[in-house]
Structures are given as structure tokens and as C-alpha cells.
């Protein structure tokens, strides 16, 4: 009898544990978003090169990379709901804006849907408790309109002309314009020079407002970095 009771307890525990672990990594469990924009010139002048989308060369402006749920300890959830795949029909009204503000630069050339699918399934599915698929992409587009990074930089005399600028001046000009401290990510061009690649801004859980970042990503840039043309 004791053996039977012990077996039943073990079976019950095995049934309960998966739901506990699932809940801990559910789409409800995140603290804030990183809103990440990338400079196309710095994507394309690396040794990997780039391919323009089917719609043609994007504008010389920062493009959306993604809207990423994140934890305050620096980790993040990913691929939270395989039952909610990307469905382009849900964002049919956004496609014109998506192609302009969220262009793909990956090779081979494409429409952008593979890029958006990746972003939704890896990151967007982890925010479903707050925003659905259409709202996820609409939120990113709204944030892009609110945060004119290129305008903030050019206003401060920081232009995409291949010259080097201080990392401090880049950060300060964005903060002065937008009101919040950015995180700047660098990569290296084909000659190994450090350059402005991506800018991270932090957004509250609702996706509606910018906030000061609870934590910044790892990595660092040099004191002087290039801002390449595109």
C-alpha cells in the first residue's frame, strides 16, 4: 500500500512539474522591452555584405531590428509559443510601413517576411500576454516614429559620412533628443574598424512608453567610432 501511495505521489509530481516550468517561462514573464534599431551602412560594409530587399535599396535611415522582451537580470525569454506562428495576413495593413521601416538586408534578397517571422516567433511570442501579433508590429512601428535617431544625430553634427565620432557624443545627442539613455552597439567593417551598428532603447511592458534601461546588454565600443555612409 505504501509503495502504491508513493508511486501515485511521484506520478502527480511529474504531471505538475512541467506546468510549473512552463509558467516560469511563459509570455507573461518579462520586465521590459529592448527596442533595437540598426544602421544599414554598418550591416552592409562588413565582410558578410548584405542584399537589398526585393523592393529595392532601403532609405539611408535606421531600420527596426526588433522589439525584444527582456528580464531585469539581463536574460530574456525566447520562442515562447510555437502554436502562434507568424501570419502575414494579420499585418496586411502594415506591410507598406514594414517594408520602409523594418527592411531586411539578409542574403539572399527577400520581401522581409522571413525576417519578420523570425522576430515574431523568437521574441514576439513572448509578449502575447500584453500585445498580440498585429499589435507587436504596430508597436514597433510607433516606436520608430517616436525615436528619430538619424535626426537626433545629424542635429548634433554627427553624420553618416564615414568619419569617426566620440561614443559619448553619440549617446549624449540621442539622449538629449529622445530623453532616455541609449545603449550603442558596434560592429566592425571589412577593414576591422569599429563602427556604429545598433541603438537600443528600453520600453515599458505595455510597449507604450520609453523608460531608462534597467540593464544594458554586454559588449562595448571604442571611445571613437565610425558612422559609415549607406
From Swiss-Prot:
It comes from the Eukaryota. The keyword Signal applies. Residues 1-22 form the signal peptide. Keywords: Disulfide bond, Endonuclease, Hydrolase, Lyase, Nuclease, Signal, Stress response. The keyword Disulfide bond applies. GO terms for molecular function: ribonuclease T2 activity; RNA binding; RNA nuclease activity. It is an enzyme of class 4 (lyase). Belongs to the RNase T2 family. May remobilize phosphate, particularly when cells senesce or when phosphate becomes limiting. This is Ribonuclease 1. It comes from Arabidopsis thaliana.
